[in-house]
Protein backbone atom coordinates (compact mmCIF):
# COMPACT_ATOMS: atom_id res chain seq x y z
CA UNK A 1 0.00 0.00 0.00
CA UNK A 2 2.79 2.46 0.83
CA UNK A 3 4.25 1.98 -2.64
CA UNK A 4 0.94 2.97 -4.23
CA UNK A 5 0.94 6.22 -2.26
CA UNK A 6 4.48 7.11 -3.30
CA UNK A 7 4.53 10.12 -5.59
CA UNK A 8 7.76 8.94 -7.20
CA UNK A 9 6.38 5.61 -8.42
CA UNK A 10 2.85 6.77 -9.23
CA UNK A 11 3.38 7.10 -12.97
CA UNK A 12 4.85 3.60 -13.21
CA UNK A 13 1.80 2.08 -11.52
CA UNK A 14 -0.62 4.14 -13.60
CA UNK A 15 0.96 2.83 -16.80
CA UNK A 16 0.93 -0.77 -15.54
CA UNK A 17 -2.72 -0.53 -14.51
CA UNK A 18 -3.63 1.02 -17.88
CA UNK A 19 -1.79 -1.73 -19.76
CA UNK A 20 -3.49 -4.40 -17.66
CA UNK A 21 -6.92 -2.81 -18.27
CA UNK A 22 -6.29 -2.80 -22.03
CA UNK A 23 -5.32 -6.49 -21.97
CA UNK A 24 -8.45 -7.42 -19.99
CA UNK A 25 -10.77 -5.36 -22.19
CA UNK A 26 -9.14 -6.68 -25.38
CA UNK A 27 -10.28 -10.20 -24.45
CA UNK A 28 -13.91 -9.11 -24.78
CA UNK A 29 -13.88 -6.49 -27.57
CA UNK A 30 -11.59 -4.59 -29.91
CA UNK A 31 -9.53 -1.89 -28.21
CA UNK A 32 -8.09 1.04 -30.15
CA UNK A 33 -6.13 4.14 -29.24
CA UNK A 34 -8.25 7.30 -29.22
CA UNK A 35 -6.19 9.91 -31.09
CA UNK A 36 -8.35 12.72 -29.65
CA UNK A 37 -7.80 11.70 -26.02
CA UNK A 38 -6.50 14.54 -23.84
CA UNK A 39 -4.99 13.21 -20.60
CA UNK A 40 -5.02 16.65 -18.98
CA UNK A 41 -8.17 17.47 -17.04
CA UNK A 42 -8.80 21.18 -16.57
CA UNK A 43 -8.67 22.08 -12.93
CA UNK A 44 -11.10 24.10 -10.87
CA UNK A 45 -10.43 27.83 -11.23
CA UNK A 46 -8.60 29.18 -8.16
CA UNK A 47 -10.04 32.56 -7.21
CA UNK A 48 -7.14 33.61 -4.96
CA UNK A 49 -4.67 33.19 -7.84
CA UNK A 50 -6.64 35.34 -10.31
CA UNK A 51 -5.84 38.94 -11.14
CA UNK A 52 -8.58 41.49 -10.49
CA UNK A 53 -9.88 41.53 -14.09
CA UNK A 54 -10.12 37.73 -14.34
CA UNK A 55 -11.74 37.54 -10.92
CA UNK A 56 -14.32 40.18 -11.90
CA UNK A 57 -15.10 38.25 -15.11
CA UNK A 58 -15.66 35.00 -13.18
CA UNK A 59 -17.90 36.74 -10.67
CA UNK A 60 -19.89 38.43 -13.46
CA UNK A 61 -20.35 35.08 -15.19
CA UNK A 62 -21.08 33.16 -11.97
CA UNK A 63 -22.02 35.18 -8.85
CA UNK A 64 -21.19 32.17 -6.65
CA UNK A 65 -17.53 33.08 -7.22
CA UNK A 66 -18.21 36.36 -5.41
CA UNK A 67 -19.40 34.65 -2.22
CA UNK A 68 -16.32 33.87 -0.11
CA UNK A 69 -16.92 30.85 2.13
CA UNK A 70 -13.42 30.28 3.51
CA UNK A 71 -11.80 33.56 4.48
CA UNK A 72 -8.43 32.06 5.38
CA UNK A 73 -7.90 30.40 1.98
CA UNK A 74 -10.15 32.76 -0.05
CA UNK A 75 -12.35 29.91 -1.30
CA UNK A 76 -15.63 30.89 -2.93
CA UNK A 77 -18.96 29.13 -3.06
CA UNK A 78 -18.38 28.76 -6.82
CA UNK A 79 -15.16 26.81 -6.27
CA UNK A 80 -16.88 24.48 -3.80
CA UNK A 81 -19.78 23.88 -6.19
CA UNK A 82 -17.32 23.23 -9.04
CA UNK A 83 -15.58 20.66 -6.82
CA UNK A 84 -18.90 18.97 -6.10
CA UNK A 85 -19.74 18.87 -9.82
CA UNK A 86 -16.34 17.40 -10.65
CA UNK A 87 -16.05 13.77 -11.74
CA UNK A 88 -13.26 13.35 -9.18
CA UNK A 89 -14.93 14.69 -6.03
CA UNK A 90 -16.35 12.71 -3.14
CA UNK A 91 -19.27 14.77 -1.74
CA UNK A 92 -18.00 14.91 1.83
CA UNK A 93 -16.43 17.74 3.80
CA UNK A 94 -12.99 16.12 3.46
CA UNK A 95 -13.55 15.42 -0.25
CA UNK A 96 -14.24 19.10 -0.89
CA UNK A 97 -11.36 20.07 1.40
CA UNK A 98 -8.91 17.98 -0.63
CA UNK A 99 -10.10 19.46 -3.93
CA UNK A 100 -10.32 23.19 -3.17
CA UNK A 101 -8.90 23.68 0.37
CA UNK A 102 -11.68 25.17 2.52
CA UNK A 103 -10.72 24.46 6.13
CA UNK A 104 -6.99 24.33 5.40
CA UNK A 105 -6.23 27.85 6.67
CA UNK A 106 -5.29 29.22 10.05
CA UNK A 107 -8.75 28.62 11.58
CA UNK A 108 -8.77 24.97 10.39
CA UNK A 109 -12.40 25.19 9.29
CA UNK A 110 -13.74 26.85 12.43
CA UNK A 111 -15.39 29.53 10.32
CA UNK A 112 -16.15 27.80 7.01
CA UNK A 113 -16.94 24.16 7.87
CA UNK A 114 -20.60 24.83 8.74
CA UNK A 115 -21.01 26.71 5.46
CA UNK A 116 -19.33 23.90 3.51
CA UNK A 117 -21.74 21.40 5.13
CA UNK A 118 -24.71 23.57 4.11
CA UNK A 119 -23.45 23.88 0.53
CA UNK A 120 -22.96 20.10 0.24
CA UNK A 121 -26.42 19.40 1.70
CA UNK A 122 -28.02 21.92 -0.64
CA UNK A 123 -26.15 20.54 -3.67
CA UNK A 124 -27.09 16.93 -2.87
CA UNK A 125 -30.63 17.82 -1.82
CA UNK A 126 -30.22 16.08 1.52
CA UNK A 127 -30.66 17.20 5.14
CA UNK A 128 -27.61 18.51 7.01
CA UNK A 129 -27.55 15.30 9.06
CA UNK A 130 -26.83 13.28 5.89
CA UNK A 131 -23.58 15.13 5.12
CA UNK A 132 -20.47 13.26 6.24
CA UNK A 133 -16.99 14.39 7.17
CA UNK A 134 -15.14 11.67 5.30
CA UNK A 135 -17.16 8.45 5.11
CA UNK A 136 -20.51 6.92 6.03
CA UNK A 137 -19.12 6.32 9.53
CA UNK A 138 -18.20 9.98 10.10
CA UNK A 139 -21.33 12.08 10.67
CA UNK A 140 -21.06 15.83 11.19
CA UNK A 141 -24.33 16.22 13.10
CA UNK A 142 -26.09 13.72 15.33
CA UNK A 143 -29.58 15.15 15.56
CA UNK A 144 -31.70 18.17 16.30
CA UNK A 145 -30.95 20.72 18.99
CA UNK A 146 -33.42 21.62 21.73
CA UNK A 147 -35.09 23.99 19.27
CA UNK A 148 -35.71 21.05 16.93
CA UNK A 149 -33.25 22.16 14.26
CA UNK A 150 -30.27 20.28 12.93
CA UNK A 151 -27.48 22.83 12.70
CA UNK A 152 -24.12 22.63 11.07
Show which residues each predicted segment covers.
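Local cysteine-cluster metal-coordination motifs and their immediate loop/turn environment
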Residues: 66-80, 98-117
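Low-complexity, small/polar and acidic-rich linker and loop segments
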Residues: 125-151
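Flexible, glycine/charged-enriched surface loops at secondary-structure junctions
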Residues: 30-37, 93-94, 128-131
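FAD-binding beta-loop-beta segment adjacent to the flavin cofactor pocket
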Residues: 1, 48-54, 59-63, 67-74, ...
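Single conserved hydrophobic/aromatic residue that forms the stacking wall/gate
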Residues: 2-9, 13
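Active-site-proximal substrate-binding core of FAD-dependent oxidoreductases
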Residues: 24-63
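Short, charged, surface-exposed loops that flank catalytic or proteolytic processing sites
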Residues: 86-94
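An active-site-proximal "capping" alpha-helix that borders the catalytic cofactor pocket
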Residues: 14-28
Amino acid sequence: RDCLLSRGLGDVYKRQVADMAVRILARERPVAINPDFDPHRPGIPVLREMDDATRAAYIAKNPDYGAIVCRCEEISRGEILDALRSNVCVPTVDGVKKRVRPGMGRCQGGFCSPQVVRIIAEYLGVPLSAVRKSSADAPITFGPTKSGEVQA
